[in-house]
Each structure stands twice: as structure tokens, then as C-alpha cells.
Amino acid sequence: MESQEKQADFFQIPKSMDYRNRNKKFRKAMAPVHLPLSCYKVPKEAFPPSPECWRVHPSRPNATPCLHLDKKPDLFTHWRTLNEQRKERESKSLFWKRRNFPRYFKDSAQMPNLHVSISKLTLKPKEGPGLLDPTKDPLKWQRLKELTNGLNSPQEDEQCYAAYALGHLGISNKFVMEALWQVAQTGSTKVKNEAYKSLASLGCLDKSVIKAFIKQLMEHKESQRLETLVGLRVALNSWAAMPKNKKPEVPYEEKLVLLLQNLIYKPLNEESLEAALCLGFLRPSNSIVQQFLLQCLSKGSMSQRMKALRMLVKMMNVHSAAVTRAILEQLHSNVIDDRLEATQMLKTVGLEKIQAQGLVKLTFDLLKRKMYSEPFQVIRQAVSETVDVLKMKPLIMKLMEAQLMSPDVSDRQEAIISLGALGIRNEKVFHLLLDMLDAEETKSVKKSIQETLLVWASRNPWIQNKLTNKVFFVYDIPKAVKTEHTRFRKKPESPDDLCITDFRRAKLNPLFITKAYNKLGEKLEAPAFSFYFSKPKKQRPQATGPWEPKIREQLRNMVLPQNRFLFWL
């Protein structure tokens, strides 16, 4: 009876105790806990593993050999073991992601600047006037507000400066244009002139603006007239860059053209050149302007010639022999932007016109010389792009590769620098440079080889992988440095100042350029082999006779009382 009462009590348990996933949690709580195996039950591993573990699977013949173990130890349910396995899987996946992703020199500060894309090498024209969003650039918006308030200043100089600055900022918001118009109507003569210039540069070629320009050109002195012409040229430049369907008509154009032609007939100077440029925007096919600009190519200064070339090549499409010769002369300009723009103009002229003019040999020799005489890598790369467009690159590369074997040091160095900009065609040249790096005795040539290899590696992943563990030595002139105590030595601020004497203790980044440091009076040479290889051991004479008696004698000596303490060390 008692057992029946207990069963009845058990079945009378209210159903409110049954909750969701109760059985699952009960099963989980009653499951046995598998602790890590003891040291006696852990499966043993054989070292070294058999060669079978390192063989490549037939389905992946090109895969990198790695260790494959079929027998894996039992998985433990202990949370620490599971956490370690998860971290190991994540590290493996991260490793393969990095392996598949192309390696770039992220640790080196100089590598990203070695190779520049051609889109960055092209000089883009300045953007025309536009609107400004106050949310994107609040500081510039605040500057605009301050300048517009400066137009209402009681001092004339502040008003002139505000009008001048608003024109150069190139922002044509409504409140800016209204403030400039108000000052142009109510201000003094000096302020009016600056306001009209700013309005013209912001794209407002109204009747009153052009009328004010004509008045200034007729009345002002030469210095003030030059400033007016420069402002008019800037306004007409932005006007000429507009699409034809959106380009407005210039009021009083005929009167302005006649006035500019009268200024051209004067002797060649900055004023007449600016007038010719303004007239070139209004009348691109005017023969008078073309003759004046062609005359400027032979008589003017380098900066004046460059201004004339821009108008002739880009606006008037004049590609004569005189223009080509002037472009080649601009490759020797002291201004880096002019040299860069000259390479682009040669691409605009094209190979066919250069051949028709009979200037192929002159162009070839000059571009070939510019490949190694140019001090900046960016310009050398731009020259390489121009040589490629003009279909001269294969011949120049062939000549430079043959010049690598020249006995003259300067010829070898010129070829190495040129190939750094031209690139590499086959592996033989790469291996030849590596051999030259080891065999070359001239330090300047060695440095050029190192720079060429670094430039190649910055744009060629194959060369980059080949040079990953390569360490370059840059030799410096020995300096008399007072040795200090290790405790008081200053840490080098940059890796270039680091002096590595023992590479076994140094963490080498890819293509890390180290400096070989030597004392006065000592000659330091690069080691013949890397420190990562073990040093060859001294050859010992082979043991003769039976070896068992010798071992027994050593064991007997170890058991002696005076040597018994050795076992406890």
C-alpha cells in the first residue's frame, strides 16, 4: 500500500514544473564529464614522423608540402582544450589567407613611394568653381563667412583682401556671389577691380564684368594691366573647359579681341604673352596668335615657352617640328612639373608625327639619356611610360640589358638605373643583377643595384617573394664615434639608424636595408654566407680501435666517489 501511495504522490506532481527544453538540459546535466587523459593514456607520437606524412596529395600536385598526420589524439570535452583547438583553427585560416593574398612591403616606409600609378603621374587641370556643403568642410565654410563679412569692413585693404581671397577659393555659393556683386557696385575703384576679377574667376562673365575688364586694360598702367590679364586668362581658361552646350557667350567679345590683338603687337614680354593666351582661348584658330606663340618658343624664357606650349599643344592642336623640339627642350627644365608635363605632351604628339618630322633619333636618344640622368624616380617612370607609348621600349631595354656586361663602371650604372624604371622582361636579368650584387666592387653601382631590385619588388610579386629574406648592406663612411656604456646608449629613432652587427639576434623585415658599421682603420666586408646556416664543424680524426673499453672506462670514472656529485647537477 505504501508503494502505491508513493507512486500516486509521484504522478500527482503539477505540470507547472515541466518547462521548455527540460529533457535536453536534464540529459546534458546527466552526461558524463570527460576529463583530459592522464599522461599514461595519452597516445604517443613518433619523432621524426615518417616521410609518408610529408608527401603531396595527388589531387593537389602544386600544393606546398606540409605535415599530414592520420592518427589524431582523442578530442577532449574540457573547455580549455576546446578553446585551444578553436584558436589553432583560426590561426591556420589566417595563415592561409595571408599566404594567398599578395605580399606587400607594409613594414617598410620607403616601398609604397617607389612605384607610382600612371593615373597619379598625369597632371590634372584645376577644378572650376563649385558649391560648398557646410557639413563636409565646416572650417572652410567658416572661412567663407569671415571673408564675406570682411567685404563690409571700413578699411579698404581688408575689403581688397577679402575679394581677392574669395576669388582664389573657387567657391561660387549664392551668398558669396551676392556679396561680391554688392561690393563691385558700391565699393571704391580698387575694391571694384578686385571684385570683378573674383567674379570672373568664379565663372561670372557678365556684361558689366567684361566691360570692367576692357576699361582696366585701356586705362591702367603696365603692372596693373598684367594683373588684369592674368585674372582674365584664369576666367577664360575655366570658360574654355566647359562643354560646348553649356558654354555661355562672352559679351563684347569682338571689342575684347581687338584690344588683345593690339597688346600682342608689342615686344615679347609677360604682358604680350598673357594677352596672346587670352586670345588663344577666344580664337584657337587665329593665325596671328599661333605665329606669336611659335616665336615665343625660340625667344622666350623656359617658363614662357611652357605657357606657349600648353596653348599650342592642348588648345590649338599645333604639333609641328618646332613644337616637338620645344617639348624635348622642356625635359631639361628645372621645374619638375614642367618635365612631367613634357612627357605627356610627347604622348599627345605621337610617334607618327615625330617620324614625319624626322625627329625619331633625337627623341630616342634624349629619352634614353633621361632614363638614367633624371634624379627623381617618378619622372623616370613617366619617361618609361612615354617610351612605351612611342614603341621605343623594347629597343631601349635590349640596349640596356647588353650594357650590363660593359667593363665601364658608368655604363653599367646607367643600365641598372634605366632598367629600374623600364622593368624586367625575363628571369635572366634578375639573376644577373643578383650575381652582380655579390661580385660588384664599386659601392655606387652596388647601391644602384639595390635600388633597382627594390623598385622591381614594389611592383612585381614574384621578385618580391624572391627577395623576402634578402638583406642589403649599405656601406657608410666610417665615423669617429665615442663608445658609451650600454646603459646610456640612445635607442635609434628610425630603423635606418640601427646598426646591426649580429643578424642572429635581429628581427629582419622583408628587404630591410641595414648599414654595415665599421671602426676607423678597419675594413668590414659582408659575410660569404648567412648567419642562419650552421657553422661548419672542425674535422676531427676518426676513432681507431674498439670503442667499448673506452666507454666502460668513462662509466667507471663517473661512478667513483669524487665524481658522484655530477649525477645531481
Curated annotation (Swiss-Prot):
InterPro entries: ARM-like (IPR011989), ARM-type_fold (IPR016024), HEATR9 (IPR052873). Disulfide bonds: none annotated. GO terms for biological process: hematopoietic progenitor cell differentiation; response to cytokine; response to virus. This is Protein HEATR9. It comes from Mus musculus (Mouse). The lineage of its organism: Eukaryota, Metazoa, Chordata, Craniata, Vertebrata.
